[in-house]
Swiss-Prot record:
This is Small ribosomal subunit protein uS2c. Its main location: plastid. GO terms for cellular component: chloroplast; mitochondrial small ribosomal subunit. It comes from the Eukaryota. Belongs to the universal ribosomal protein uS2 family. Gene3D superfamilies: Glucose-6-phosphate isomerase like protein, domain 1, Helix hairpin bin. PROSITE patterns: RIBOSOMAL_S2_1, RIBOSOMAL_S2_2. GO terms for biological process: translation. Keywords: Chloroplast, Plastid, Ribonucleoprotein, Ribosomal protein. It comes from Mesostigma viride (Green alga). InterPro entries: Ribosomal_uS2, Ribosomal_uS2_bac/mit/plastid, Ribosomal_uS2_CS, Ribosomal_uS2_flav_dom_sf.
Length: 228
């Protein structure tokens, strides 16, 4: 696996944290200074921890483990979906519904409903129903597809969860902790790195930063899956 260079990370703005007044003191060991009231992340540590996370994912993928990518903010949404699909993994990129993992049996029922409605749509059955009934089912289909399409092929709880924006996805983080599912999280200067099994200190707001790091994590999974 090709490692990420410090210059490449700087160009992507990985080192830019949040305003100093909004920091989490638990991130102090990953911060090397500040500029104009913005904390700057130590990219040497980012590179090291990204490499550790990639090694972990590569080995897990080699063993046939399942992965879930989570990132619902607008800057991350498209990246999460495309990189998860490339890594033959699952994703949540619109909204974390409470109990997505801790109440998996209920979510599985909703996924079955989604598949059933998609089949009915494909076969043209929805168009043969009375107008009101068809409208209700089409609304259901739209909503289920929006929130659950990235989980359609997930038969069991994931073995590893990759998270962009720990603060925003705190409910996902808590569910993983409760179930003992390891997490890899991009942690900005306002996050708590102790909540992640493998934290990666990084700018979790800039599209280029998110894209660079998530694509590297997906690369590790992709390569691990192809080891004979």
């Amino acid at each position: 696996m090709k490692s990420v260079g410090l210059e490449e990370m700087m160009e992507a703005g990985v080192h830019f944290g949040h305003q100093t007044r909004g920091w989490n003191p638990k991130m102090s060991s990953y911060i090397y200074g500040n500029r104009n009231g913005i904390h700057l992340i130590d990219l040497v540590q980012t590179a090291r921890l990204l490499s550790e996370a990639c090694d972990f994912l590569f080995n897990a993928a080699k063993e046939g483990k399942e992965f879930l990518f989570v990132g619902t903010k607008s800057q991350a949404s498209d990246i999460i979906a495309s990189e998860a699909l490339r890594a033959e993994s699952h994703y949540v990129n619109q909204r974390w519904l409470g109990g997505m993992l801790t109440n998996w049996s209920t979510i599985k029922t909703r996924i079955r409903k989604l598949k059933d409605l998609e089949q009915k749509e494909k076969n043209g059955i929805l168009d043969t129903l009375p107008k009101k009934e068809a409208a209700v089912l089409k609304r259901q289909l739209y909503k289920l597809r929006k929130y659950l399409s990235g989980l359609q092929d997930m038969k069991y709880l994931p073995d590893v969860v990759i998270i962009v924006d720990q603060k925003r996805e705190i409910n996902a983080v808590k569910e993983c902790i409760k179930l003992g599912i390891p997490t890899i999280s991009l942690v900005d200067t306002n996050c708590d790195p102790t909540l992640a099994d493998l934290p990666i200190p990084a700018n979790d707001d800039a599209i280029r930063s998110i894209n660079l790091l998530v694509s590297k994590l997906a690369d590790a999974i992709y390569e691990g899956q192809r080891v004979k």
